[in-house]
Regions:
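Conserved functional loop/turn residues at catalytic and ligand-binding sites
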Residues: 13, 108, 148
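Active-site region of glycoside hydrolase catalytic domains
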Residues: 35-78, 124-125, 134-482
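Short alpha-helical segments used as structural interaction elements across diverse proteins
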Residues: 3-4, 8, 110, 470
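Active-site-adjacent substrate/metal-binding segments within catalytic domains
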Residues: 59-137
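A structural signal for short, well-ordered beta-strand elements
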Residues: 2-3, 361
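N-terminal export signals
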Residues: 2, 8-30
């Protein structure tokens, strides 16, 4: 395979990148691993798709034998969600899935990432499966395949069967997840080639059991939270092993994780190295443990007596090899070099830092590049996907009924420009899933925050294309930033 000279690299990455290379700044590890791309263009066969999750769009919470989930209970608890809103109906995709597949086809999308409702398939969390629940996903998958769209299936996106006593506090829950993963693989791997175990470990552990913002809404002590994190990791590992043992040959297994991504304050050698160190250490309880099959010394030292209790082969299971890593990327953190023991210092965002409609969604387009680069340089995965990226906006219909979400287009165009940089530099980025296909139930924010590129009228469930959908369709057609 051809190795590029620095002069050729300068032509490929432009003036800013060339200046860094000529000045002696360290080149990214991936340079020279892929053919040069035209400006703004992505590799041939780059996979473009959209993403959703079961509880956020399906509705039909009591249909066809589905059991209650923790989010059904939580959302119906007064004061837990915006104006008491629930996912009881949501976007009603359980009944309107063909409409959603049609939207994907109109976009030209080649993949759809969605999650299974665990309690729809196993109403009691384990034991006897619900054939009607499984049949829904088989219909959805067949509809996708018949439309030329590849299904990417996430097994767990926060909606835990309520029947699993103790939830993630119990070591039995990872075991139940392994059984569920095995069943899903046996029944679906004849038509699903890509499975993800869990989505965003920190959200169904810390936000749910430490901060109390998400179901079940608890605020537990550090030792308990660390053990819950460990159980989440163990579920992932058991899920990987179960999928491999029960699926057809060629099935690809990964996860979708939202690590804290540290952007170097200055793009120079020492600050890049500091940001990479921060990425590894600050994600020690989650992605780092998955990729390395161990907890870092720094994490164990910080937690001390509160560190998780590890049994037998737990860490080996947690570190089960993956075919790909999915990264959910939204907002940046920042780091710089420091002379202290860690080698890095974290920078705080000022009050004036820009954000989208969700106050937590700070804007930093370069974060998507650094998420990919840090992941590659630390662990060298076989493949990386951006499994979520998108934003909330204050969408509204104009006098002509159009939804011109120019702010979302701005956000996406800037982030995808930095995604293209990662592709141009040869990192193993294989695809991108925009969050989200349609407006949905945004957890504790209810229906107050809209992330979709299709507007959903939550009274009629009618879908309307936004400007961002037109923009994304054009990008897919060009295979280049539009």
């Amino acid at each position: 395979m051809k190795r590029f000279t620095r002069r050729e690299i300068a032509k490929t990455i432009g003036v800013a990148g060339a200046a860094g290379a000529v000045a002696g700044m360290p080149l990214p590890a991936a340079f020279g691993q892929a053919p040069a791309l035209k400006p703004r263009a992505f590799p041939t066969n780059f996979l473009w798709g959209c993403a959703t999750s079961a509880y956020q769009i399906e509705g039909a919470v009591a249909a066809d034998g589905r059991g209650p989930s923790n989010w059904d209970i939580f959302a119906h608890t007064p004061g837990k969600t915006h104006q008491g809103e629930t996912g009881d109906v949501a976007a009603d995709s359980y009944h309107l899935y063909k409409d959603d597949v049609k939207l994907l086809k109109e976009l030209g999308a080649k993949a759809y990432r969605f999650s299974l409702s665990w309690s729809r398939i196993f109403p009691e969390g384990r034991g006897k499966p619900n054939a009607a629940g499984l049949a829904y996903y088989q219909r959805l998958i067949d509809e996708l395949l018949n439309s030329g769209i590849e299904p990417y299936v996430t097994l767990f996106h926060w909606d835990l069967p309520q029947a699993l006593e103790g939830g993630w506090q119990s070591r039995e829950t990872p075991k139940a997840f392994g059984d569920y993963a095995a069943y899903a693989a046996r029944k679906l791997s004849d038509r699903v080639r890509h499975f993800m175990t869990t989505n965003e470990l920190v959200c169904f552990t810390d936000l749910s059991y430490q901060i109390g913002q998400f179901a079940p809404g608890l605020k537990l002590a550090a030792a308990q939270v660390n053990q819950i994190r460990h159980h989440g990791l163990l579920a992932h590992g058991l899920g990987v092993q179960a999928i491999r043992a029960n699926s057809l040959s060629g099935t690809q297994v990964g996860l979708a994780e939202n690590p804290k991504v540290y952007v170097p304050l200055i793009e120079s050698g020492e600050h890049i190295e500091a940001a990479k160190l921060a990425f590894r250490e600050e994600n020690a309880p989650f992605l780092t443990a998955v990729m390395e099959g161990k907890y870092t010394d720094g994490y164990l030292k910080r937690e001390g007596a509160n560190a998780p209790k590890v049994q037998g082969d737990d860490l080996k299971i947690i570190g089960s090899p993956l075919n790909f890593v999915g990264l959910n990327v939204y907002q940046p953190e920042y780091a710089r070099a420091d002379s202290g023991e860690s080698g890095y210092a974290l920078a705080r965002r000022p009050a004036s830092f820009p954000h989208m409609a969700s106050p937590w969604l700070f804007i930093g387009p370069e974060v998507i590049y650094w998420a990919i680069r840090h992941t590659n340089d630390l662990w060298n995965p076989r493949a990386i996907y951006i499994t979520e990226n998108g934003c909330s906006c204050e969408d509204f219909r104009d006098a002509d009924g159009r939804i011109e979400d120019t702010d979302r287009v701005m956000f996406l165009r800037n982030y995808l420009t930095h995604l293209q940089r990662a592709a141009a530099e040869g990192y193993p980025i294989k695809g991108y899933f925009l969050w989200s296909l349609v407006d949905n139930f945004e957890w504790a924010d209810g229906y107050s925050k809209r992330f979709g590129i299709h507007y959903v009228d939550f009274k009629t469930r009618e879908r309307t294309r936004k400007l961002s959908a037109d923009w994304y369709r054009e990008l897919i057609a060009r295979n280049a930033v539009a």
